[in-house]
């Protein structure tokens, strides 16, 4: 009888822990209602993908994943300069976005997209 109680308790514990998903959820750009996510969708997603995952173009060029992996630009200033001035195939957004909007995108990339480094 004691064995059955222990078995039932063990099954209950296993079932209880199986109900919890321990994988952290990734920040979803497409579901976000923030202004920064809206800026990303309007200006960055066309090239970097709807979730910032990057992609390969038909001509073989690679648009980088800005969420994970190694990043060429890591500091706020480097990211700001790259968004504002473009380069390496990226168009400059100075004149398209305000200084404040570029800074908001920098914070969005650093705070929300790269927080799972």
Describe the role of every protein-language-model region.
Residues 19, 44-47, 90:
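Disulfide-bonded cysteines in secreted/extracellular proteins and peptides
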Residues 1-19:
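Sec-dependent bacterial lipoprotein signal peptides
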Residues 23, 51, 87, 112-116:
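A general structural signal marking secondary-structure boundaries and capping sites
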Residues 19-39, 55:
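Electrostatic cytochrome c docking/interface patches
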Residues 36, 40-50, 105, 109:
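The canonical Cys-X-X-Cys-His
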Residues 61-113:
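Extracytoplasmic electron-transfer domains, predominantly the class I c-type cytochrome c fold
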Residues 57-59:
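Conserved catalytic-core motifs of eukaryotic protein kinase domains, centered on the activation segment
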Residues 32-41, 97, 111-117:
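Short sequence/structural segments immediately N-terminal
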């Amino acid at each position: 009888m004691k064995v059955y109680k222990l078995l039932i308790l063990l099954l209950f514990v296993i079932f209880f822990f199986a109900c919890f998903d321990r994988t952290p959820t990734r920040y979803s750009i497409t579901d976000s209602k923030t202004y920064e996510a809206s800026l990303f969708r309007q200006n960055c997603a066309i090239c970097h993908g709807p979730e910032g995952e990057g992609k390969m173009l038909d001509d073989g060029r690679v648009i980088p994943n800005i969420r994970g992996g190694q990043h060429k630009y890591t500091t706020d200033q480097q990211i700001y300069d790259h968004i504002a001035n473009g380069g390496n195939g990226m168009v400059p957004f100075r004149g398209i976005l305000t200084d404040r909007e570029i800074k908001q995108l920098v914070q969005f990339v650093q705070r929300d997209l790269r927080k799972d480094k």
